[in-house]
Regions:
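An acidic, low-aromatic, low-complexity terminal/linker signal
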Residues: 1-176
Length: 176
């Protein structure tokens, strides 16, 4: 009987070890991976660990008395998700949505927010040594949300700090 208890504890211990190894492996496979997308002619990137899914543009229900860049809310399989238009957040002129327009559903600090982008490009690996600090500039709303500049071959991707994009004065996007 005592032998069975020891075996069970040993098996549970091994299972816990395997679960921890799987978590580490999952983190490693996402390390340095970024979802890239376009706003106008510029390429942007967000760390893949914050991305839940990408959906096509759909009906957005307006909510009164909110900031202009918050387009409203969507019902995603029973979950109500606030949606912001990244163009408007960056103070770029609004543009009519096309068949390439997507909503990137993100999650940070247990807050789920959809980001409307002109077009999703791909998932890229951008190693840390290929990411430079953001340029020192005080011009424009966009620079406030830049985490760095990623170099991919001859191209650059503007790395977005999702926390700063979603939080305005320490409040989540949907709070007043």
């Amino acid at each position: 009987m005592e032998e069975q208890i020891i075996e069970k504890d040993s098996v549970n211990s091994k299972l816990d070890e395997l679960k921890q190894l799987q978590l580490i492996e999952d983190e490693d496979t996402q390390k340095d991976k970024f979802l890239t997308f376009r706003i106008g002619n510029e390429d942007y990137a967000i760390d893949i660990k914050y991305i839940n899914e990408i959906i096509s543009i759909q009906k957005i229900t307006s909510v009164p008395n909110i900031k202009k860049y918050i387009k409203g809310i969507i019902n995603l399989r029973g979950n109500i998700i606030p949606v912001i238009d990244v163009r408007l957040r960056f103070h770029i002129d609004e543009k009519e949505y096309t068949d390439k327009t997507c909503i990137v559903v993100t999650s940070i600090n247990n807050v789920h927010v959809g980001l409307i982008v002109d077009e999703v490009s791909e998932v890229l690996s951008i190693p840390e040594d290929k990411i430079s600090p953001p340029p020192q500039t005080n011009k424009g709303a966009k620079s406030r949300y830049i985490q760095g500049i990623g170099r991919v071959g001859q191209k650059v991707k503007v790395m977005i700090n999702l926390f700063k994009l979603l939080y305005d004065e320490e409040k989540p996007v949907m709070e007043n």
